[in-house]
A protein has these predicted regions:
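Conserved Nudix-box catalytic region and its N-terminal flanking loop in Nudix hydrolases
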Residues: 16-56
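Active-site-adjacent beta-strand/loop module that shapes the phosphate/pyrophosphate-binding cleft
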Residues: 72-100, 109-117, 130-141
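Hydrophobic pocket-lining residues within nucleotide cofactor-binding pockets
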Residues: 38, 61, 88, 116-119
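Short connector loops at helix/strand junctions that flank enzyme active sites
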Residues: 4, 12, 33, 77-81, ...
């Protein structure tokens, strides 16, 4: 069985959480985290996360901490999602790069700031549900 590892970031930007609104022309949009697949050239999960943050939102991250792992078994591939919490140190959308930015068929990615509270999170319909459930239960612990 092949295993595919992905890294995902729940980002804190000041007093807000930062997510991505992902959408396609003529299709529904949804909210998700910054992140993607770990590539063979990534030194480790953290390096992959930092690369994805730069590619998708042009962000430099502070220290990262893994808080949740979700395993999605499949017939041919098992996907392991590693979720990290990190502060955004700076962000410049003009620094975005990577395949997502070059191929319109992959949709668009727009950063969205959300208040650091349960009500705002519930309104997002954040995917996947395991992450949304975890955040609703623990978000109070993330306040400074």
């Amino acid at each position: 069985m092949k295993v595919r590892r992905n890294v995902r970031a729940v980002l804190l930007d000041g007093d807000d959480l930062l997510f991505l609104r992902r959408g396609w022309p003529g299709g529904p949009s949804y909210f998700t985290t910054v992140g993607g697949g770990v590539e063979p050239y990534d030194a480790d999960l953290e390096a992959a996360l930092r690369r994805e943050a730069m590619e998708e939102i042009g962000a430099t991250l502070g220290p990262v901490a893994e808080f949740l792992t979700v395993t999605e078994p499949g017939e041919r591939v098992t996907v392991v999602q590693h979720y990290f919490r990190a502060d955004v140190l700076d962000m410049d959308l003009s620094r975005r790069n990577g395949p997502e930015m070059d191929d319109p068929d992959l949709g668009n990615f727009s950063p969205v700031r959300v208040a650091l509270d349960v009500t705002a999170l519930a309104a997002l319909e954040l995917q996947p549900t395991e992450l949304a459930d975890y955040l609703r239960e623990h978000i109070g612990e993330w306040r400074a």
